[in-house]
């Protein structure tokens, strides 16, 4: 199945009017509306941005995926139907130093690679999952006790370059670091629907009010 097409066509998590995403003005981050959720992330130099939805914060590959559309303001956007509070999501980005290749797949692929960093400082790497800088909540830290004790991985996976990564005490087969897919392990952004109850504004007559500093 082609990258970016693994998602429902109707109902929960289905795209809502994708033909309008390029001209939309959704604010940055994930915004929960009445029946839909909008996603928006800024990148001037990215050439493709993939939104991924996860069922668990750690240990699983992405469940759904969507290509975001770039607006004239260099903000990449999408709108999905009925994305519930607490949903985990993240992004993968391609850029001038690592353009999208039809052969690229999740799971330690180097397809499309040109350089770890180019003359303009671009360091795009689709194998390194990115959380939303405007997320209201993250699922976990870059390195957790569970990651180390149960899965024998550490934060060394997030690096790039030609050397090899093989986990803690070389428990895993060595993989060129730039190609190691951090998707199952990286921190995920969390969709948060603000349900904060601010209460009812007190109505106190002026003669009974007190000013406190």
Label each residue range with its predicted role.
Residues 2-34, 73-75, 82-213:
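The feature marks proteins involved in alpha-glucan
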Residues 50-52, 90:
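Beta-strand signatures of extracellular beta-sandwich domains
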Residues 42-48, 83:
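Short proline/glycine-enriched turn/loop motifs at strand-loop junctions of beta-rich domains
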Residues 35-39:
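Structural beta-strand segments of beta-rich domains
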Residues 15, 60, 64:
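Catalytic cores of carbohydrate-active enzymes across secretory and cytosolic contexts
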Residues 64-71, 78:
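Short, surface-exposed loop motifs enriched in S/T, G, D/E and P with embedded aromatic residues
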């Amino acid at each position: 199945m082609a990258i970016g097409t693994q998602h429902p066509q109707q109902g929960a998590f289905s795209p809502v009017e994708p033909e309008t995403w390029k001209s939309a003005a959704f604010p940055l981050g994930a915004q929960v509306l009445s029946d839909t959720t909008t996603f928006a992330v800024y990148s001037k130099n990215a050439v493709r941005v993939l939104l991924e939805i996860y069922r668990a914060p750690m240990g699983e590959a992405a469940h759904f995926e969507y290509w975001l559309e770039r607006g004239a303001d260099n903000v990449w956007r999408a709108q999905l139907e009925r994305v519930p509070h607490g949903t985990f999501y993240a992004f993968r980005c391609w850029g001038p130093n690592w353009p999208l290749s039809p052969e690229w797949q999740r799971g330690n692929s180097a397809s499309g690679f040109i350089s770890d960093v180019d003359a303009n400082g671009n360091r795009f790497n689709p194998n390194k999952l990115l959380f939303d800088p405007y997320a209201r909540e993250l699922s976990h830290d870059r390195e957790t006790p569970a990651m180390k004790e149960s899965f024998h991985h550490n934060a060394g996976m997030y690096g790039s370059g030609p050397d090899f990564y093989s986990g803690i005490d070389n428990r895993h087969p060595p993989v060129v670091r730039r190609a190691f897919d951090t998707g199952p392990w990286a921190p995920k952004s969390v969709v948060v629907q603000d349900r904060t109850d601010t209460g009812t504004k007190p109505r106190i007559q002026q003669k009974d009010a007190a000013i406190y500093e």
